[in-house]
Amino acid sequence: MDENREVQGTPEADRRPVVTIGAEQLHQATETLQRYKQGKTNLEKRVIDNEEWYRLRHWACLRAESQKQQVEPVSAWLLNSIANKHADAMDNYPAPNILPREPGDVEEARRLSDIVPVVLQQTGFERTYSEVWWDKLIGGTAIYGVFWDGSKLGGLGDIAVEPVDVVNLFWEPGITDIQRSADVFYVRLEDNAALERAYPQLAGNLGGSTLNVSAYVYDDTVNTADKSLVVDWYYKRSGQSGTELHYCKYVNDTVLYSSENVGTPWYDHGKYPFVFDPLYRIKGTPCGFGYVDIGKGTQEYIDRGDQAIMANMLSNAAPRFFIRSDGAVNEQEYADWTKPFVHTNGNLGQDSILPVTGRGLSGIYLNVLEQKIAELKETTGNRDVSTGGSTSGVTAASAIAAMQEAGSKLSRDSNKAAYRAFREVVELVVELIRQFYDAPRQFRIIGESGRQEFVIYSNEALRPQAQGVAFGVDMGYRVPQFDLEITAEKASPYSKLSQNELALQFFGAGFFNPQMTDQALACLEMMDFDGKEQIMQRIAANGTLYQRLLMVQQQAVAMAQLADQLGGTNYAMQMLGGGQAGQQPMPGGVPDIKADGGESSVTRNARETAASRATPT
């Protein structure tokens, strides 16, 4: 999407044609790209093989060319583990909460907390989040690309957050942080006709590239003869304001766009627009390894064991016979069970035809196979309790909940890592808003009361702000900075039910009674749950309002007593009899919410607790 950035335009004075990136620089960049590609050859091969394992086509990786006719059973134990991990991730879909660092940025942080989720929704981030999680579980690495797409909204431009395939991205070998790479290359195949329409200078210059990228094994026949590799080259240079990020888009030896030639850095934040989220880290690379790498060895032995058992079953199920060469039996008629007569020549002896006696497998082989299945579940953290089941003999709800809590530790750990990557994504989104949201835009948000609200927003409050003059010294400019708090949307129905029941328990305990404000706040300080701060603020506000009401009533009674003394009226007694608030009764009869299926409250509470504990805090 970065290639559309240039439609934003810059003043002509800032677009002086300073030719810094030319054919020679492109040749050097391509050599660097080739060196980077050689450095990640093993990674690309592993990722492509893992994709075949995920698609249950791993026999293509196991069998030899001479064994294509063998029995090839495929079991989906590893796939089931990956699918459950993906479901856990989507049940804990992240939501950003932007917090100010200075008192003057409180209002802007609140507005960003409302607008950033809308921006992510408009760019289809939920689908991106799902795609990168598949990449993370299968290949071991999820990569986000946070770009500015100048073609969106009729040329106004907007943010694009997309999944990036690790096969198409190249960086300096040996580094762990992508931001420390000297150069980063993002390579994609694009249609020649589309390129010539967008860039007329490419006419007759396409084809003959020495570059190539690794490809997956597709179901369809993919013809790349009419396609060319387009390289997005990102690199950093030292500038007046510090480290500057530059961008060059080229095909073969033709420059399509160069920010350095234009004379303006690409993104003001100065970072590569890529965020890595590895599952299990590996030293010396920003990538990691996934569940396919962990479980494919065990899955191989499971399928090979199934292969031996199935081959034995088929050989024993189909009758076979020994036939003497001089037995004079018509083999075709004997093998055809529909023919009642079988012709023979001469005498038929007892040893002319003998059935082949098969041998059944011992039960120990089935036991080993079951142990391998249990090993795969154990090593991938996909035991029965984590998928809603329980081991034999365990029926108590508290015991099941305890096992589910222990089984969700791996999910909580991987979700926390995903939230750290999501925090970096949101930081880049805020920086792009700071740089490009010059024109006011309108957003539909959900207000505090749950109603739709329409707000107009621009980056005016995010731009550098003058701090004035103090003691004759210019204090310069301040750039508003924010902290990010990542929480999980309650996608699990049991988590939602648990949150709703907690609110009813607060209501039943009188937490929202303004006369019990101090007791309620003291109790809440000892508790820990999502949204605790908002509840405490609401209860404190109710208590403050109640105290003010009492003060107003006392002043009104005093004024009424004074009026009674002067005019002989009885206003004070009337106000004391019907105007002063009395002790409010404790709420009672709070209805009990039952889960579908009429299960007991003990079981329901245990399941809700287990569902909420799967959410990282």
Question: Over which residues does each language-model region extend?
Answer:
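Extended, regular secondary-structure scaffolds
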Residues: M1-P11, E107-Q307
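Small-residue-rich
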Residues: S81-I82, A142
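Nucleic acid-processing catalytic cores of prokaryotic defense/repair systems
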Residues: P73, K85-L112
